Amino acid sequence: MLGLHVGTLMISLFLCILLEPVEGSLMQPCQPINQTVSLEKEGCPTCLVIQTPICSGHCFTKELVFKSPFSTVYQHVCTYRDVRYETICLPDCSPWVDPHVTYPVALSCDCSLCNMDTSDCTIESLQPDLCMTQRVLADGMW
């Protein structure tokens, strides 16, 4: 009976090793994709919804089975390699508020460590098109 269990375990392990590259290849690679994003600012009653390229996709990563308090785990994420910034003017802002908002436009992406200065590195962040105020579509959207 033990031989049957060990044999089944070995077959399962073999299939996991064999199919691992297939599973990774079925996932979208790290690349720029068009995403609906909301732009808003305190003092402006309107949330402007635009489409812009962001970085999204799968990055291959490994984690040690045996963890040591002396080892550091580095997780690679899909993040900006080359980026350009664009500025847009929000409508109906209060007179004392600068209506301009600057946002990143992904030109190319890379699997690398998350840079907290330019990226949201949280496990679960807000959706990129979430608005706290009234939504308005930017010209040319849909």
Curated annotation (Swiss-Prot):
The keyword Cell inner membrane does not apply. The keyword Ligase does not apply. Glycans are attached at N34. It holds the Pfam family Cys_knot. InterPro entries: Cystine-knot_cytokine (IPR029034), Glyco_hormone_CN (IPR006208), Gonadotropin_bsu (IPR001545), Gonadotropin_bsu_CS (IPR018245). Keywords: Disulfide bond, Glycoprotein, Hormone, Secreted, Signal. It is found in: Secreted. Disulfide bonds join C30-C78, C44-C93, C47-C131, C55-C109, C59-C111, C114-C121. GO terms for molecular function: hormone activity. CDD domains: GHB_like. One of its GO terms (biological process) is G protein-coupled receptor signaling pathway. GO terms for cellular component: cytoplasm; extracellular space. Residues 1-24 form the signal peptide. Involved in gametogenesis and steroidogenesis. Belongs to the glycoprotein hormones subunit beta family. Heterodimer of an alpha and a beta chain. This is Gonadotropin subunit beta-2. It comes from Coregonus autumnalis (Arctic cisco).
